[in-house]
């Protein structure tokens, strides 16, 4: 079984047309249950090295928020850029060394708002906010990834027979207080796109990001994907490193 840790970015803007956050991004970091303990241990060792203590203890932040560590805000306001870069690289290195796969979905919130105002798109009119369609696309990307993973384990005879035993399935681990809600998954499974995903996605559970280091890593991925989407012509070494090292594997846009 895979634990799929959900990260998100671009949901704190003032409005759906906030120019500073034109995209809303969700990432799913796939961690096989056999790797979960080692990733947590490596992250805790990283925190001791950078902060002198695990997250949440005296002298350390409660969690690593991407915008804070990247821009030098909050706990990291006194940290020079080089020191912050080293922390980011060490965090991303946990995923790069394992080639931990990440699937991504995103929506252009400004395009959604314009289509909603025009009222001529039946697809857009189904949703009250951009969160619904982009999470629906996220679950679709998740099911497609698992489907391809299961197909890769089949022999030629099994494929010809038309049978596909489900060897790989996922438990979705989302963040308490974030935009992912429990009702989104059954809505997807009842849709035309999700009807074949029932056996692939076990359930969805919610954890406080302060208590889930892998959700924090997934948030970092979502943040750097969003920065790349906003200015794709600029250099984005963190995003490029994740993509070139087979961490960020698929990116699904919501087409409006």
Regions found by a protein language model. Give the residues of each.
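Phosphate-ester processing/binding pockets and catalytic centers
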Residues: 1-256
């Amino acid at each position: 079984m895979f634990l799929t840790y959900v990260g998100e970015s671009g949901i704190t803007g003032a409005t759906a047309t906030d120019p500073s956050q034109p995209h809303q991004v969700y990432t799913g970091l796939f961690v096989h249950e056999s790797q979960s303990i080692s990733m947590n241990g490596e992250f805790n060792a990283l925190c001791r090295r950078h902060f002198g203590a695990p997250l949440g203890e005296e002298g350390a932040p409660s969690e690593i928020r991407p915008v804070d560590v990247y821009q030098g805000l909050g706990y990291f306001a006194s940290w020079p850029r080089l020191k912050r870069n080293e922390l980011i690289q060490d965090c991303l290195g946990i995923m790069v060394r394992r080639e931990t796969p990440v699937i991504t979905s995103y929506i252009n919130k400004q395009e959604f708002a314009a289509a909603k105002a025009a009222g001529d798109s039946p697809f857009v009119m189904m949703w009250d906010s951009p969160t619904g369609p982009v999470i629906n696309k996220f679950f679709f990307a998740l099911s497609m990834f698992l489907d391809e993973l299961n197909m890769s384990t089949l022999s030629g005879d099994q494929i010809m027979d038309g049978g596909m035993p489900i060897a790989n399935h996922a438990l979705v681990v989302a963040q308490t207080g974030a935009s992912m809600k429990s009702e989104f998954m059954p809505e997807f499974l009842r849709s035309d796109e999700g009807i074949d995903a029932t056996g692939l996605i076990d359930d969805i559970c919610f954890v406080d990001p302060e208590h889930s280091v892998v959700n924090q890593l997934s948030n970092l991925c979502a943040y750097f994907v969003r920065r790349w989407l906003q200015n794709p012509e600029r250099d984005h070494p963190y995003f490029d490193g994740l993509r070139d090292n087979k961490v960020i594997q698929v990116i699904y846009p919501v087409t409006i």
